[in-house]
Amino acid sequence: MAAQLQYQGTGRRKNAVARVRLIPGEGKVTINKRELAEYFGKKTLEMIVQQPFGVTDTAGKYDVVALAHGGGTTGQAGALRLGIARALLKADPSLRPALKRAGFLTRDPRMKERRKYGLKKARKAPQFSKR
């Protein structure tokens, strides 16, 4: 059996990392061996993951097999979106302008700010009393 053609992409967002493989197929999305709807359970997060296909009119052309870990659900959805966009770019470099215009090729650099000593959270100070 011949090796099946597949494209890989890695996405990161906050503390989440997603390793994405695109395989020519009928549009099935599997994350950590679970269906997209079952994994996220929120329509908004499902939409975020599907966005690169909508922008490039490639919906239903590729199956997605992804491994996501770290962070929360929103971070993982963002990481998957970036990973899918990067994999689509490897599959068809002519999609670059559309993906770039939509902002799907940009890694969001915002991270959680570290907690400082003397404070309760990153910026929240303990209650101040004048007397």
Curated annotation (Swiss-Prot):
Keywords: Ribonucleoprotein, Ribosomal protein. InterPro entries: Ribosomal_Su5_D2-typ_SF (IPR020568), Ribosomal_uS9 (IPR000754), Ribosomal_uS9_bac/plastid (IPR023035), Ribosomal_uS9_CS (IPR020574), Ribsml_uS5_D2-typ_fold_subgr (IPR014721). Residues 112-131 have a biased composition (Basic residues). The keyword Cell membrane does not apply. Residues 102-131 are annotated as: Disordered. GO terms for cellular component: cytosolic small ribosomal subunit. The keyword Secreted does not apply. GO terms for molecular function: RNA binding; structural constituent of ribosome. One of its GO terms (biological process) is translation. NCBIfam families: PRK00132.1 (NF001099). Belongs to the universal ribosomal protein uS9 family. This is Small ribosomal subunit protein uS9.
